[in-house]
Regions:
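Periplasmic polypeptide-binding modules associated with outer-membrane biogenesis and secretion
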Residues: 1-185
């Protein structure tokens, strides 16, 4: 199993008795599996953003010919998901993924299905726990505007601005990821 995570699916293991009565184990990992085919399928509102989807396909981290490793496969899927969920599509999710391994040909066929969900926009700010200060204090630090397209980076910038003030010991800024109201996240 350890060799499989590194892309070796046809190892040969041989045990030999040593002159001193011990056992020597010789492992030939076999050929490293390489990517033979990649299919990336998108559904949801991002389906109309052809340039963005083309850019995500071009940036796919495991192209044909690359060695297959489990860690790289996991990272490539996360990078693909982040390419949607960090900007505009906060509810994006991988709905299916598979790596079909053929040990005989040392090849892998990869498929990822991802649903972007709806495009999100920032809504009005809901505040809890602001007992000691007037709500207008928050406006000084440039919150996202209602209707502005969702961006995780924009959200974190606002949270950081609030955390860097002397007014708050801790701050959590997040959106409602409910797909029922993506226009007012």
């Amino acid at each position: 199993d350890i060799l499989a995570t590194e892309g070796h699916f046809k190892p040969a293991v041989e045990g030999r008795e040593t002159p001193g009565g011990g056992l020597a184990v010789v492992v030939d990992p076999g050929p490293r599996t390489t990517i033979a085919d990649v299919e990336l399928h998108f559904s949801g509102a991002a389906g109309g953003a052809a340039e963005r989807l083309d850019a995500l396909r071009a940036a796919w981290a495991l192209p044909v010919g690359q060695p297959f490793r489990q860690g790289d496969w996991d990272a490539a899927k996360q990078q693909l998901l982040d390419g949607l969920s960090l900007r505009d599509y906060a509810a994006a999710a991988i709905t299916a993924s598979e790596a079909l391994i053929d040990p005989e040909s040392a090849s892998a066929r990869l498929r990822v299905d991802i649903d972007s969900g709806p495009a999100f926009r920032f809504g009005s700010i809901e505040v809890t726990g602001l007992a000691d200060y007037d709500r207008s204090l928050l406006e000084r630090y440039q919150p996202p505007e209602p209707g502005e397209p969702y961006s995780q980076e924009r959200l974190l910038r606002y949270q950081t601005a609030l955390q860097n003030t002397p007014y708050f010991a801790s701050v959590v800024v997040d959106i409602d990821r409910s797909t029922a109201t993506p226009e007012a996240a």
